[in-house]
Amino acid sequence: MKGESFEDTIRMVSSYSDVIVIRHPQDGTAQRAANISSVPVINAGDGKNEHPSQTLLDLYTIQEELGSLEEKKIAFVGDLKYGRTVHSLTRAMKHFRAKFYFVAPDSIQMPQYLLQELEEAGLEYSLHRHYEEILSEIDILYMTRIQKERFEDPKEFEKVESAYRIEKEDIVGRCQEHMIILHPLPRVDEIAVSVDECKHARYFQQAANGVPVREAMIALAVGKK
């Protein structure tokens, strides 16, 4: 960019392409782009707001691994305040009558407006500081990294950066046989490498699922079936 406005950029790009895939650090930019674009816009993540394309591959992975999306017990662990993947997947799983467990320090716990949406939908949720207390109950353990780039105060990041880390011995024999571990990636220290060899670890398959899911999204956006 050479100083032009965001709106001008979108207008120009939409005249060159059949679809726009946008990732932007500011909340709401995908909607801003969609409002003025002459071609379909796919939101690949806007700030701390939403990440719907990730959610579609998450849903696909859950369906493939567990056989259905209905009434699953899902625990989100880590940065829930700024984690856009968590926000989007929570809203999606709401339609399948999931039960939610939100595991995080108070300073990065789930935003109140999303908790209110769950209450209005009549869905169960609970807040926790430690995932160990609910590990035996859940179908899905959804880990996230603590995102340094989301913190304005470095001291606040330092307080929570190592809040959660799972090791192989934390999982094996302590969870249900069918439980799966997901992560939007990249991981930092929140999942030990030793966990990779567990049958519960499905985050690399989850990432691989992103290729066909996103291909399908683009195909639908440009009118192909």
What is the meaning of each model-derived region?
Residues 64-143:
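Glycine-rich phosphate/diphosphate-binding loop of Rossmann-like nucleotide-binding domains
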Residues 21-24, 41-45, 76, 127, ...:
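General beta-strand structural signal in soluble alpha/beta enzymes
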Residues 197-225:
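C-terminal helix-to-coil terminal segments
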